[in-house]
Every structure is written in C-alpha cells, then in structure tokens.
Amino acid sequence: MERHDGEEYIPAIFGGQPPHASQVISLMKFSQETTTWNLPIMIAQALLVSEVIRTYPAELRMLHRLFQRKHPNMAEIFFILIKYLTIFAVIFDILVTETFAARTDFDCRSWAWTSSTFYFMCSTLVFCVIGWRARIIFRTSQVASWSLSVGLMGQFAVAMWTNYRVDKADALTPAGTCAPAAQVHADASQRNAALQLHFWQSSTFWFLLYNTIFESSILMACCIKLRKTSSGPSGLTKIAKVLFSNNVHYMAGVETCNVIELVMLLGWTSSLPPVHITSIAIQIVVGLQMLIGEQEAVYSPTCSQLSYSQYSSDSGGYINKHHAATSSSNGTFSTPSRTLSYVKRPGTGTTVADIGCADASGGGQHGRKGTFSSISSVPAYVKANPIVETVSPQMPSKAQSQSIPYKREVEVTVDMSPVPPPPGPSPAPLPAPYM
C-alpha cells in the first residue's frame, strides 16, 4: 500500500530540482492554510457522522414502538426525515470536498447543490420541530399559531435564499478536485472582488441572524409558559422538566454557536471560510437529541402513565395507546353512602399536573384534547360537582390493599351509594315508648 500524504507530488511541484528553503516553507504554509480553510466543513462532517452512528440504538427503539402502533407520530417522522437527509448531505459533501470521485463539472455541480440543499432543508426541519413543540405548549393560542406559521415561512425563504447565494464547489479543477467556479474559471480581478465583501452583503450573516432571533424568542417564550402552567408543589412536572431542559440546552448549544459566528462575520467577513455548515450541523445534532430525549421520556417504562395526554392523532402529537389499554393500576371500593376518588403517583404531592392519564384510567378528564396533560396543573381533588362528605369511608380489605400496585399510578373509587331495602314485607313499626 502506498502512502498518500502528498509527498509524491513534491518533485512535480519543484520540477525535479532540489527545493529552496523558502519554497518548502511556502508549501507548508499553503498546506496549513488549506486545512484551516476547510476546517469548519470537516468539523461539521465529523459531528454529523458521529451523530448518525450514535442515534442508531434510539432509532431501533423508535422503530420497535412504531411497529407496535402501526403508524408513526410527528416526532418519529421528523427524526427520520432529518437523519436520512443528513446522511445523504454528508455523503455528497464528502464526495465533493474530500475525494477525487468527480469526473466532470456536472458531477461537482450536482453533488454540491444536492448536499447544500439537504443541509438547509434539515435546518428548516429542525425549526419545524421547535415550532411544533411550541404549538403544543401554547395549546390553542391563535396568536402563537400565526406567529409560528409566519416565522416558519420566513425561515424557509431565508434558508433557500442563502442556499442559492453561498459558494459551492461546483466546478472541476485540473487536479481532479471540486472547487467554486469563481476560483476555477474567474480571472484575478473577479477573485479580488470577493475580498471586499461586507457583512451586510453576506447571506450567511442574515441566515444566522434570523435563526438566532426567532429561535431564541420561541424557546424563551416556551420556557416562560412552562414555568407558569406546569409547576407543581415540587417545581416543574416530569415532562415539563424535560421540555424546559431541552429548550435550555438548545439555546446553549445552537444559539451560542450562532452568536459567535455572527461576531466573526461582523469583523472578518472576507477572511472567513463558509461557517454556515458548522452551525447547521450543531443544529441537527441538538435537534435529534431533543427528539430522542422527549420520546424516551414519553415511552419509558417509568413514565408509561405519566406522560403526555391523548394528543389528537389529527394533530400528529404524542400518543401512547398501548399504555392506556393495558393499565391495571385502577382500584374500586364501594360502601353505602358516598363516592371517593383519588389518584396516587410516586414522587408527587396532591396534584396530577404531570400525569398524562389515558381515558381508560380515569384521568383523561383533566387533560385537554390536542395538548399535553403534563402542562395542565389540575389538582386531583378538583371536581365539577363536589359531594359533601357525611359518612367516613370504610377501609378496604387486606386482600384488596395488597393487590394495589402502589409503585405506579393508582386510581381508587369508593362508591357509598345508599343500600336498597331488602325484598319482602316491611318490618312492623317499633312500639311507642312507655309513658
């Protein structure tokens, strides 16, 4: 096997003559500058390839749940689209930037455009995931729905405009590699024009600025909404805590990267390599992790009855029919004068704000169709028609108490309706007291 580190081209570079020290130094600097210029692209490729491999176990669990339900939910659709568009984008990007596979200008142009378009489509899909989560958190708010719709259309327009404007390796060089056509076919005067680029002329700057402002606004609004509507006695409820932490992690990762790149573009627009791919790669990685974390929280065994409510299938939300159909944690106790109902959940106080109870378990009445029940802080003791307690309830038998799985959600109903009189003639009235 031959060693391919570039040394085989050195004799051709210097015409077979022993190189001077200045020539060797210049060649080494050129090699280093080329590596540095392509570093953002290589970082993005490494991040995305590692993320694709890392998510396969979670994807297998997701496909197993999909096989059981026979139909996907919106989170699974978003995950599959983002992941496999990313795979194709990375493959074409590596072919263009790291190999000699291209043979014609058409190869470079088609692969470069496909890769770039898929990258920006993944960015828009991650933006759709954020908007979809926000729509569920804000429930039926028309203002939120219109704002998210307008923002999504704006993001898609800015993404496609940036995709059209950014440089792509769409021309074949004499060496057999792909490079931007402006470098391959343009003269020196056209090349120098790119060195006078200002930040407001950069489409990447406006793409990053739009994403940073709108995503940060949505995520901060979601955090405030969760704090207001999903706090119980011990803080945020279980699923609300997952949503809140994912929002914070997304802002800490993606928006911080965007702000750093925006500052760099403000000062050194003409001196920077393409940085939008690195930002999109971080956005994809955090977005996939956000989808995986929330799906695992919903469908994990410890959260089978403590997750999202029966979110309507026409809205494409989270739904867990298997858990709702197999719930066996309900108990009923009857005695003659009143009815008592309560829900017990480990790790909570007197509320079921974080319980996504299905209708079969009796807790669906507290949820709202099309929303997460984990976001509705309705105490268990709130009833539409409260009954005044007149007789204290009887304790259940020992056998019934042992059959209740206290480790999971338990709904107990004590029916104490009046006992009907026994059949037969009514008993004779008691004699009047002796006077």
UniProtKB/Swiss-Prot annotation:
It comes from the Eukaryota. The keyword Repeat does not apply. Keywords: Cell membrane, Glycoprotein, Membrane, Transmembrane, Transmembrane helix. Induction: Expression is highly up-regulated during all stages of pathogenic development. Expression is positively regulated by the unfolded protein response (UPR) signaling via the binding of CIB1 to the UPRE motif localized at the PIT1/PIT2 promoter. The keyword Cytoplasm does not apply. O-mannosylated by PMT4. Is also N-glycosylated. Residues 392-435 are annotated as: Disordered. Plasma membrane virulence factor required for spreading and inducing tumors in infected leaves. Glycans are attached at residue 330. Residues 418-435 have a biased composition (Pro residues). It comes from Mycosarcoma maydis. Residues 392-404 have a biased composition (Polar residues). This is Virulence factor PIT1.
